Regions:
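A short, surface-exposed loop/turn module that caps and links secondary-structure elements
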Residues: 28-53, 81
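Enriched for short, Lys/Arg-rich terminal
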Residues: 1-12, 16-23, 38, 54-58, ...
Length: 82
């Protein structure tokens, strides 16, 4: 399993989400760290170098190395690309 790190703003992002959805998002992050499974897509443009994990109506923006996943933001899809 890859180590998971969070940028300082991520806890606030997660607290702003309904608890059930937040738990689903955290489970999806852990599943991806363990297995690589999930709806992941590399981003381009101003977000180039980041990956996006789609979890329901939310998007998890992160970068990945061989042994670490660093979560940058967790946002509702309506706010994700603004």
């Amino acid at each position: 399993m890859k180590a998971i790190r969070f940028y300082p703003n991520v806890p606030a992002d997660v607290r702003a989400i309904e608890q059930k959805a937040a738990m689903t998002i955290l489970e999806a992050i852990h599943r991806y760290a363990e297995t690589g499974a999930g709806r992941v897509k590399p981003l381009s443009g101003e977000f180039e170098g980041l990956l996006r994990l789609r979890v329901g109506n939310h998007r998890v923006f992160f970068e990945e190395t061989a042994d670490t996943i660093t979560i940058h933001r967790v946002l509702d899809r309506k706010e994700a690309y603004r």
